[in-house]
């Protein structure tokens, strides 16, 4: 039996005909990846400057991670948490020691990790802080992106995320991002019923919005002054992406809870987790939260390998060094379509000046033709986030492509 070889156009048409229309991809059909590169079905090579929204920090198909995946897949994939397995405990030990927390609660997607953190925060609020049941509040920031579930879109200020999905989950207070005075006002007025604040140290989907220096520390201090948990959503910013293990590390902040995902598996499986100390984590007991796949042997084995790659190959340090080069060089672009560049480490964004009918989407199409893949967020911002394994030589080649495209518009 022979397998039909589809053309790129046919593959796009298959998705259009048989798949839900909840994404608007660039018209590129990929079939292979290695390191910082991906290849389409026609054999064309591209720099990957999206990294699956920072899930592929270790590069595509990293041999160590793939080897761990294949070895465990031949041995045991799934048991559920009804039984112990020989992979989860070693993973939890390695991860908690590496990240510096008492406990890890394994989940699958980033949204699941966030939902888990919200449940833990409310449980802590009732059992430890003494908030009257069903009255706990959680503070969120405008412009956030924490996931797509009903509860999480309740927290969103983006109509595309929450429009016509109501009614929404109560118990959230939204304040402007990067505004500690707004946080102080809410805590002064309602702090006795606030169990937590959840925030992204850098807002990725909002356009790699980097808050003012000291913002995260100010939020942390205000929360602790009111006996409120500080939760950092590091699903996109964590695991080396910003040039530190966690983006919060730039300000010396150790959150009460951290959500992680994406690069936790090196882009091979949906693997996420919540990190917290015993006071928070042990408020949930057996049967009170769980996941069939959370912590399954395959995920545990892959996560250990993925974290070892980050640590042993010094990818965090590489992100810090090359991020400076990227921003310095991109800032030199001479084009009326270029406005500014911002970011930390290898999580960066270019703010464009749409004009003459050319927006960020059109620029991304031109970048793809030149062999570099990036994706716009909103109409005027392009996120650039290559795998952290990128070399300086590769980075400078990619910068050349970006400069050429902007300066030829």
Regions found by a protein language model. Give the residues of each.
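Conserved N-terminal phosphate-binding loop of PLP-dependent enzymes in the Aspartate aminotransferase
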Residues: 1-409
